[in-house]
Amino acid sequence: MAQGQKLMTSGSIPKQMVFFALPILLGNLFQQLYNTVDSLIVGNFLGSQALAAVSSSGNIIFLMIGFFNGVAIGAGVVISRYFGAREIERMQKAIHTTVAFGLIVSFFMTLIGIFFTPTLLRWMSTPESVMDASVTYFKIYFLGSFGSIMYNFFVGILQAVGDSKHSLYYLIVSSVVNIVLDLFFIAILKMGVGSAAMAKIISQYISAGLCLYLLLTTSGTHRIVLSKIKIHKEFLGEILKYGLPSGFQNSIIGLANVVVQSNINSFGDMAMAGCGAYSKIEGFAFLPITSFTMALTTFVGQNLGARQYDRVLKGAKFGMICSMTLAEMIGVIIFVFGSQFIAAFDATPEVIQFGTLRGQTSAFFFCLLAYSHCVSAILRGAGKSMVPMIVMMVCWCFVRVAGLTIMNALVHNIWCIYWIYPITWSLSSITFFIYYHRIDWLHA
């Protein structure tokens, strides 16, 4: 087995899952830290309106880029199954098709993001007080979306063959670069909100470049050869079969969250800043969720490729328990210390109030959020990507939008908007629980 590759079809399940998930968790921790420090620097040096402009970016970015990140997950599923079955030639064709497809879509995504950002911001009821700063931030950010999308495709390839360590190293490098540039641009040169986007895209291109260099020089079977990068129709069809549902799932969730954000925006820039600060804190609860869902997708994909059905079930159970437990532990911390965390971003009383209430509403439901994401990851690894897409579309999109429409007709209260998240997390968890335990998804 070449350096970096890890075949998870035999050996201790807990050890393999933890050692695969841990680098992802640490990498995501560094990424979350630099996102948090980014907002801390913006909030403390540029003020509440700049913080509102930057903090509201997450939902639009997820809507625009999340689709292709979902396709990257689908590519990882295909590659991991061929890797588990030791069909190296087919795996190689899938890898080079993935890279070719990523290059094409990332180019078009850059253009779409730049030209449609103002329209999206107006549609989200972004206050005029932060509109100019928001447009500036987004246009600069989407110039770097090429690096962001390609990084996710490269990481999908690495994780499919069991390599979660190198992405950790590269995230550490890019995180440090991002923080240093933030301080240099904003604190020293006194540049505006656009400089925060500049720092982010530079760091994204660095991490993507490091991943590409590794894939070009590795001695492993997942090595990329530039002359072999092309679209193989058979493998593109397979990648899209698994990736499109994941991509649509991300876009659907992103669309619903944009609707939620537009409702929050109607309460003014203090609400935007408070909820934006909270979103950075909530990101820490997503760390174990993201880490173990990635581990679960790879683990299930490899073991189904090797027809190790019993290991799939044991690994799925272990991953779910770890993710749910860790996420809820972080939720309790957020519930207890939420106001202090929010104050670190912006000490304005209204900002603290809006952010703290958001955290107190959601904190005890993170275990359900983790469960939904874990089952979704397991089903994607098993090639059942349509199921989580449908569940998320109904529970996290239709129910959220319909619920907001009904609540807004009855009362204009931000507390009601906050509750839409735990309610829909609960609905999706119930649905996934029934499907997971009543349907033979493993052999079907």
Q: For each of these PLM feature ranges, what is it?
A:
Residues 1-21, 79-144, 188-244, 300-365, ...:
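Short alpha-helical transmembrane segments in multi-pass integral membrane proteins
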Residues 10, 14-33, 37, 60-67, ...:
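Residue-level signal for short hydrophobic patches within transmembrane helices
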Residues 19-38, 140, 151, 174, ...:
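Transmembrane helical elements of multi-pass membrane transporters/channels
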Residues 24, 28, 40, 44, ...:
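Transmembrane alpha-helix boundary and packing residues in multipass membrane permease domains
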Residues 29, 33-51, 121-128, 184-191, ...:
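Helix-terminus/linker motif at the lipid-water interface of multi-pass membrane proteins
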Residues 48-59, 134, 138, 197, ...:
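Small-residue hotspots at the loop-to-helix junctions and early N-terminal turns
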Residues 51-111, 148-167, 261, 274-338, ...:
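Small-residue-rich hydrophobic transmembrane alpha-helices
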Residues 72, 140-159, 167-175, 196-209, ...:
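Short runs within selected transmembrane alpha-helices of multi-pass transporters and secretion channels
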